[in-house]
């Protein structure tokens, strides 16, 4: 397979925390994710799942090794260039939703791009509304997060992740705060984004039922890549 068909490649990836008694979080992790695929990362607590996602998402730098996202070596980007790349290429979905309590669902979805869309806010609002309606939230556009169920809040968070037309969705335990039925709905939704919209999805989960929606599953243990199924 040619290099330009990969959305993510990591080579010899290591991450160590602490200056004194250093704690290794990732040890020599190398993996490749094909563009347009859905990959789940599984493993026990402390296995390095979220650390790996943060490195791929450009939220942190590796201690050593290489991360390439959409053909770009992340280590070569700093400051505004890194932020611009992240905003253009990656959408994030978190376990705790991270919605602003005082903003409506519509405003939360618009928020990431508001500083960059001056004079075009009507187009941004139209895009946000279309996303929310497409996720079944037509009647919730002007509701505050506290007026929404957990599953509805996570769908708002997914719409927010899609607002910038990303190539890659990174979802860190997106069903961890949901009941099993809502969790399954989010799993199916992520699969829809991958299969029907062609987005690459990288999911961290401890739930085998949610991981089953992925094309492949990577297993981590003690910071090491131990298996891929």
Residue ranges of model-derived segments:
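ABC family nucleotide-binding domain
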Residues: 6-220
């Amino acid at each position: 397979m040619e290099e330009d068909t990969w959305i993510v490649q990591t080579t010899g990836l290591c991450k160590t925390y602490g200056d004194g008694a250093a704690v290794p979080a990732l040890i020599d992790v190398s993996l490749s994710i094909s563009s347009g695929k859905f990959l789940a990362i599984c493993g026990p607590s402390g296995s390095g799942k979220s650390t790996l996602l943060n490195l791929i998402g450009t939220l942190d730098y590796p201690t050593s090794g290489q991360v390439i996202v959409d053909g770009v070596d992340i280590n070569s980007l700093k400051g505004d260039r890194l932020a611009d790349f992240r905003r253009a290429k990656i959408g994030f979905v978190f376990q705790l939703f991270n919605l602003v309590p005082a903003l409506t669902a519509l405003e939360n979805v618009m928020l990431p791009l508001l500083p960059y869309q001056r004079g075009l806010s009507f187009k941004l609002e139209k895009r946000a509304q279309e996303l929310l309606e497409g996720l079944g939230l037509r009647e919730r556009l002007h509701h505050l997060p506290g007026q929404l169920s957990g599953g509805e809040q996570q769908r708002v968070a997914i719409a927010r992740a899609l607002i910038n037309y990303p190539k890659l969705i990174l979802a860190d335990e997106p069903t961890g705060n949901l009941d099993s039925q809502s969790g399954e709905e989010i799993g199916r939704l992520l699969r829809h984004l991958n299969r029907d919209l062609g987005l690459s999805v990288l999911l961290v989960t401890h739930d085998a039922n949610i991981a089953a929606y992925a094309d492949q599953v990577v297993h981590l243990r003690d910071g090491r890549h131990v298996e891929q199924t």
